[in-house]
Amino acid sequence: MIKIHLSRLLGAHRMTQAELSQKTGIRAATINEMYHELIERVNLDYLSRICEVLGCKVEDILEYVPDSYKMQYRADRQN
């Protein structure tokens, strides 16, 4: 499973989803899907744009979590 830490990064930068959308040229709906970890595929160009705007690395946005932790992660998100 891949976790997306966009919500944490935007909070750290005190930036809204709308501001990130405007600065990157990425559709607001796509930013929202990434923010809520609902997106199934991530465009590499989008990652590059986000990294440029937020001054971060790809590994700051994406994290690989072994599938053995998937069930616990889902349970934690529902609580």
PLM ranges: what are they?
Residues 15-33:
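Short alpha-helical DNA-recognition segment
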Residues 10, 35, 46, 65:
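DNA major-groove recognition helix of helix-turn-helix
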Residues 17, 44-47:
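Helix-turn-helix DNA-binding elements, focusing on the entry/boundary residues of the two helices
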Residues 8, 62-79:
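Short, charged recognition helix plus adjacent turn
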Residues 10, 21, 51:
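The alpha-helix within a helix-turn-helix
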Residues 46-51, 61-62:
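Hydrophobic micro-packing sites on short alpha-helices
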